[in-house]
């Protein structure tokens, strides 16, 4: 492919953090070059490479994800001109996407949704709905900033309604499921299975600074269930007829399991595979919920597999070498540091979740980069030192 598949880039956070201006060019290509007059976005960008536009159905997770990432890029850089220049086409894409995938107009996506597993999901599920919730939550804030209060009010009402409905429909007490009357009516579904990517939009929303899109207590319970059911200490007993990214006595987080039965006759083909890009995003979300031990166990399993002996530690393979999905790993750095930045409101803050008494980390945003050092003495006095190695953050409040 061209290396720009929008739903795979949902996971990757390294470029957005380290080179935000470069990431912005991707949003401009998606919305100002590739988008058609109806608001439909191809999931691969080809026109910018001098090729014909991709003639395939759009990706639900990718199109909503690109909208959410507009919010992220805006927050990382504080670039209002970028937001103004992309706004009209972003709204065109949003309106198309809601009409395309919320078929009954109740606020919950339920249509035929092409996703990153190279198949279509049917019916409500939280993999796509959390991304959608993050996108419309971000639109509310962007609209308010631009003085478009009618739009903000419209999508705030939709968000508040949809967030409640998604949770009520899909949370089974342990994790979020896919709602289908007959899981075998369509091939490649997961039904009442425990999908590792069920909180993908939550990961994306938190990486962008949007907070929760589903109830905090249900998010944590779902993460506990993902770890309980999908983390395998040994892959020996996991039948897998697809690609082998973990095997024998290696550990890993499979993409889906069916702890309550109900495995479809033809589940989505990759369900028994292990993808590092998914493992990292789950680990990051776990850290947000205080599940440090579980997160580190997953990360260690990845690094044990890519140990430089069995596999190259610099090329975590999926649909090829140096695949972009594992760039979700970058989010470990700001998440462990409890780092957040908002260059629109010119604030940045730190709240390390490990080694709090003596912690040093790297920080970066659209204004500059440097280091942060924190110490806590025996009396509980906290000392914080922010060093700027490039750029200027004189107008940024450090909290």
For every predicted segment, state its role.
Residues 88-92, 222-225, 300-304:
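Amphipathic alpha-helical scaffolding segments
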Residues 145-193, 201, 206, 210, ...:
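Repeat-solenoid scaffold signature
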Residues 25, 85, 214-216, 394-397:
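Short helix/loop capping segments that flank catalytic or ligand/cofactor-binding pockets
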Residues 246-251, 268, 272-273, 279-399:
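Non-catalytic C-terminal accessory modules of carbohydrate-active enzymes
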Residues 1-166, 207:
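Substrate-binding cleft of carbohydrate-active enzyme catalytic domains
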Residues 1, 20-57, 99-124, 167-275, ...:
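Extended glycan-interaction surfaces of carbohydrate-active proteins
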Residues 7-11, 16, 62, 125-131, ...:
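An alpha-helical repeat/solenoid feature that recognizes helix-turn-helix modules
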């Amino acid at each position: 492919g061209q290396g720009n598949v929008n739903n795979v880039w949902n996971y990757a956070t390294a470029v957005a953090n380290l080179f935000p201006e470069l990431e912005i060019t991707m949003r401009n290509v998606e919305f100002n070059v590739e988008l058609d007059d109806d608001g439909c976005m191809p999931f691969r960008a080809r026109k910018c490479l001098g090729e014909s536009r991709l003639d395939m159905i759009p990706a639900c997770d990718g199109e909503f994800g690109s909208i959410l990432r507009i919010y992220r890029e805006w927050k990382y850089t504080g670039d209002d001109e970028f937001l103004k220049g992309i706004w009209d086409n972003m709204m065109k894409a949003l309106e198309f996407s809601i009409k395309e995938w919320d078929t009954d107009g109740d606020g919950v996506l339920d249509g035929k949704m092409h996703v990153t597993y190279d198949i279509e999901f049917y019916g409500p599920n939280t993999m796509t709905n959390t991304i959608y919730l993050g996108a419309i939550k971000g639109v509310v804030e962007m609209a308010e900033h631009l003085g478009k209060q009618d739009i903000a009010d419209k999508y705030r009402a939709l968000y508040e309604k949809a967030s409640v409905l998604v949770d009520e429909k899909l949370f089974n007490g342990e994790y979020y499921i896919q709602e289908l009357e007959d899981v075998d009516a369509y091939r490649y579904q997961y039904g009442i299975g425990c999908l590792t990517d069920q909180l993908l939009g939550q990961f994306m929303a938190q990486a962008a600074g949007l907070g929760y899109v589903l109830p905090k207590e249900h998010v944590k319970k779902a993460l506990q269930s993902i770890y309980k059911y999908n983390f395998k200490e040994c892959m020996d007993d996991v039948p897998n007829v697809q690609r082998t990214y973990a095997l024998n006595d290696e550990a890993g987080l499979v993409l889906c399991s069916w702890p309550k039965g109900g495995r479809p006759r033809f589940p989505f083909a990759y369900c028994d595979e292990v993808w590092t890009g998914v493992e990292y995003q789950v680990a990051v979300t776990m850290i947000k919920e205080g599940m440090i031990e579980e997160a580190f166990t997953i990360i260690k399993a990845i690094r044990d597999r890519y140990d430089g002996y069995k596999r190259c530690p610099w090329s975590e393979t999926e649909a090829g070498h140096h695949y972009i999905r594992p760039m979700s790993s970058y989010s470990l750095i700001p998440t462990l540091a409890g780092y957040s930045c908002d260059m629109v409101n010119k604030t940045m803050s730190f709240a390390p979740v490990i080694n709090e008494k003596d912690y040093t980390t790297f920080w970066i945003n659209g204004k500059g980069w440097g280091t942060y050092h924190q110490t806590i003495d025996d009396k509980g006095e906290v000392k914080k030192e922010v060093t700027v190695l490039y750029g200027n953050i004189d107008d940024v409040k450090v909290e």
